[in-house]
């Protein structure tokens, strides 16, 4: 009887582990690059940390259904707290928010006012500390 329970438990744990690995967020797309001029653009709100609150509200409304409230990614959406994301310039993140990447499920937010997109970038910078790179 104990062997059957152990076997059943092992099978259940294996299925859970396999399912969990299939649900990992995508790695950032290294071919989705902002043009140099866009990447070099500084965040005009960088010295106004109080505006991050607006970015947090926008993130909850527009982004959390895919990236989660903490930005760690749900399903195939990338972890926005990761080193690979956080190492990108503010201008690059702004460009990606603006243009999107429909091949990867990221919509364009070009219709969102520019300052609100910059607030989102500022909020991304306030997410939990990024994981260390390789």
Residue ranges, per PLM feature:
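Bacterial N-terminal signal peptides that target proteins for export
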Residues: 2-9
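Electrostatic cytochrome c docking/interface patches
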Residues: 27-58, 129, 134
